[in-house]
Amino acid sequence: MGQKIHPIGFRLGVSKDWTSKWYAEGTDYANYLEKDFEVREFLRKKLAHASVSKIQIERPRNGAQITIFTARPGIVIGKKGEDIEILKKEVGKILGVATSINIEEIRRPELDSYLVADNIAKQLERRVMFRRAMKRAVASTMRLGAVGVKVSISGRLNGAEIARTEWYREGRVPLHTLRADIDYGLAEAYTTYGVIGVKVWIFKGENLEGLEADTSNTNELSDEKRNRRKPRNANRRKE
């Protein structure tokens, strides 16, 4: 059911990686998970205008390392690195351990699903027509080399009394294929009529890393099985 399941969770361990990397036992797991949620909520609000896409949290021994993926690193770092030092202290208070923050720049924000969804949501809040916002976003993403894009918008569109879902797609987006490199993002637009959800799927091509090794292993196994087979007439008595 590739259409129903979360595209990132479906591909974890295959072509996608976890955004929280740590190990915990017992009650520590719930505490770590809650702290991760608090940190992400805090950074999303604090860096609302910095085009932050993803926040990765790692917990080595007696510390924490946070990587912020953003299209506008200058806003996060601040003048002479002042803002990032303040962020370290505030995040360290939430986690209760020494924290380091790394910044990763997103070179092409048009190919990042969350940033595309967030851009559409902000346009909807400015009362831009939803079809125009969808088509503009899809066109700019396809122009930069995406194989396929799908955008879905749900809610009281144009202030309608009954909520509905509208979607627009260009290219192909194979949700069932595990090796397909599909980026998925969700954003919300808060309008006077209510909340409108924006979902974006971007297909960037097939991830073939490790595929050649797997096929070579299967070929070796098939050769071994073929050699083990006995000829049909081996068990027959010679007349």
From Swiss-Prot:
CDD domains: KH-II_30S_S3. Keywords: Ribonucleoprotein, Ribosomal protein, RNA-binding, rRNA-binding. The keyword Ribosomal protein applies. Residues 215-239 are annotated as: Disordered. Gene3D superfamilies: 3.30.300.20, Ribosomal protein S3, C-terminal domain. GO terms for cellular component: cytosolic small ribosomal subunit. GO terms for biological process: translation. One of its GO terms (molecular function) is rRNA binding. Residues 227-239 have a biased composition (Basic residues). InterPro entries: KH_dom, KH_dom-like_a/b, KH_dom_type_2, KH_sf_prok-type, Ribosomal_S3_C_sf, Ribosomal_uS3_bac-typ, Ribosomal_uS3_C, Ribosomal_uS3_CS. Pfam families: KH_2, Ribosomal_S3_C. The keyword NADP does not apply. Residues 39-107 form the KH type-2 domain. Belongs to the universal ribosomal protein uS3 family. Part of the 30S ribosomal subunit. Forms a tight complex with proteins S10 and S14. Binds the lower part of the 30S subunit head. Binds mRNA in the 70S ribosome, positioning it for translation. This is Small ribosomal subunit protein uS3.
